Amino acid sequence: THDHPEQHWIRYRHLAHPWKRRGPDAHDPTPPTDIAQLAQQKPLPIDNFLGYNAGRDADNIRAWRDTSQDRLWVGDLFLEAEVQFASSETEVVFELSRGVNRFQAQFTPGRVTLRRIGKGAEEFGTPSRPCRIQAGQRHHLRFANVDARLWVWIDGRRVDFGPEANYLPMEPGPEDQADPEGWVYANDVERPASIGVKGKATVRHLVLSRDIYYTSARLPPDFSQPDVYYVQPGHYLCLGDNSAQSS
């Protein structure tokens, strides 16, 4: 619960502890949520690692090799939470970073507004829509930045911003000190996802999700000429074994 006239933030940092693979720490009972252990870790950009079919040898006697393409940066993120707005003056901001930009959805009773922080902010503007958020009520809010478009849902209903929610990704410049993949430390490592509150509000059931990227680095050339399958109306084609290791 936040109750202050000034805005304060909760920021996520991706602390991905290395797997205890071998040697004396293979059976270390220390939980990954141990505060002392977390304090020693450095945040990383959010990546596309999947535990399923990860290409890792669980037997610590044999040599361990990392063969999967699961360390690629993921910038398409989804942030959701249940928020109770105490008054008509309450302001809640969901923020997602991607490269040189930070994108925001500002929720207030009766209105939601989108913003782009950084390069391209003037061209994007501040598109705004009326919404059904009410003071004193509890609402489920969801904000996503996927495929160069911002998405907003309130209580399961999408708020339609039309083409105003689309944006053109900006290339980082030398001053941004970006990684070759495109992520920027100040945004994608220090604060990839955040929630800011001004006034009184209670935030519950906070969830951060990421898109899943399927990459291919070493597939045979003939895989580029697949067979054609026709799916009839009312039917679907089920694909399994979906992980970065096997894609």
What is the meaning of each model-derived region?
Residues 1-247:
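Soluble "head" domains of membrane/secretory-pathway proteins
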